[in-house]
Amino acid sequence: MWLRRHIICRAWPEINDLMKNPFKNTAFLFGITKHKNLPEDVGIEILLSGRSNAGKSSALNALTGNKKLARISKTPGRTTEINFFEVEDGFKLLDLPGYGFAKSGHSRRKDWGPLLGEYFENRKALEAVLVFMDIRHPLKPIDLEMIELCESFDVPYIPVLTKSDKVSKNILMKTIQLVSKTTNAMEVLAISSSKETGFEKLRKILIGLKND
């Protein structure tokens, strides 16, 4: 009896942490550059998309509570792989290279068009897309292209406005309303990675998508 209580007491802090943040144990799996290297089409995948400087990597780190999970490059556009992160068995986050790929070369940018098209058209595991946008510069043409891609394949998407601490509450609300009116998104969220605000709601939505 004592041993059982001892084991439960030692395990409780970790269980409690997972209850607070179910993304806490998210781990990097691998990166791919070609459609043929995609893993088996099973489980649930959430695609993370956004411009090179939208704060997507910082958001992923804040979402999971692991500041070292996604490497934050000092030169936006360096990442050229789709990186797979496993939240739990059968539930993955896919980090797409930032739009523009300004430092990756024109030929590399051309390669991603067919890859994304094939992924959206054929991937049964794709559950939803998070479209990260700097709240100060939302709905750029490249953002709208991603949104149109989601809508053309009937893939649910959620605009996530980053760096919300950089604007006033008035501008924050107006921007959320603008994005809501401009898109057919299921919801619009505002987050701040530096202040760690907005992530509790984002986690609940993602867990809801997993369990849907």
Question: Positions of the model-derived regions?
Answer:
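Conserved C-terminal guanine-recognition region of P-loop GTPase G domains, centered on the G4
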Residues: 118-186
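Conserved G1/Walker A P-loop phosphate-binding module
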Residues: 12-101
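Canonical P-loop GTPase G-domain recognition
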Residues: 23-33, 167-212
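Conserved nucleotide-binding/hydrolysis micro-motifs of P-loop NTPases
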Residues: 78, 91, 98-101, 136-138, ...
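Conserved nucleotide-sensing/catalytic segment adjacent to the nucleotide-binding pocket
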Residues: 89-126
